């Protein structure tokens, strides 16, 4: 068993897809780390505010005194610091496209997906259609591939997987909506099954029932504002 490298610490949240993807990367690389769980939606700890005063959110990686926020930046840092089991593609073009689609997921799909959760019943059909149009773009990207990273899990698998099937889809499920039906998205559903077969993914997926309950509480808070 590898010895714990000095100063590798992750400040995260069990329910956060952004934290979970970082854990996937650390586990894939075989990097032992200390983990501190933040209930940051209730109250932000002094430690979190100290480590990430700009965005005040998880995850934050601390490595030998260096502090790094933002999950996608952390994934790239991990990949360049521990070079075994590469996460990002080697070719400059493929690397750029992985970043492009990761940004699309975290900015477009996440934003519109979260917005769809609080739509009124009269507008929910329109919201579902809008989200599914975005998800269809990912369906087209994964067609014919085992994983976004090829034969092994990579950067985009971690970003898409942590956010869509293992977070947003659970929130939609809690509202009685199947946002990624197999008949409409056969390739994505095949990819999700492949993803679930990977040990580090299974280790990092939050408990389904607990996660759905948590997501419904968040939706309730947003609707109450």
UniProtKB/Swiss-Prot annotation:
Carries keyword Cell cycle? no
**Primary location:** cytoplasm
The positions annotated for binding glutathione are 16-17, 43-44, 57-58, 70-71
Instruction: Tell me its EC number(s), please.
Output: 2.5.1.18
Q: Which compartments is it annotated to reside in? A: Cytoplasm, Cytosol
Where in the numbering of this chain does the GST N-terminal domain appear?
6-86
Any one GO biological process:
toxin catabolic process
According to UniProt, the reaction catalysed is: RX + glutathione = an S-substituted glutathione + a halide anion + H(+)
Name the SUPFAM superfamilies on file. Answer: GST C-terminal domain-like, Thioredoxin-like
GST C-terminal domain location: 91-218
Query: Could you confirm whether the keyword Transferase appears in this record?
Result: yes
Q: Which UniProt keywords apply?
A: Cytoplasm, Detoxification, Phosphoprotein, Transferase
Q: Which domain of life is it from?
A: Eukaryota
Q: Which GO terms describe its cellular component?
A: cytoplasm; cytosol
Coiled-coil-forming residues are: none
User: At what positions is Phosphothreonine found?
Assistant: 152
UniProt cross-references to Pfam families, sorted A to Z: GST_C, GST_N_3
Named from the GO MF annotations, one term is:
glutathione transferase activity
Question: In UniProt terms, what function does this protein have?
Answer: May be involved in the conjugation of reduced glutathione to a wide number of exogenous and endogenous hydrophobic electrophiles and have a detoxification role against certain herbicides.
- Family per record: Belongs to the GST superfamily. Tau family.
Task: Supply the name of the protein.
Answer: Glutathione S-transferase U3
Q: Which organism is it from?
A: Arabidopsis thaliana
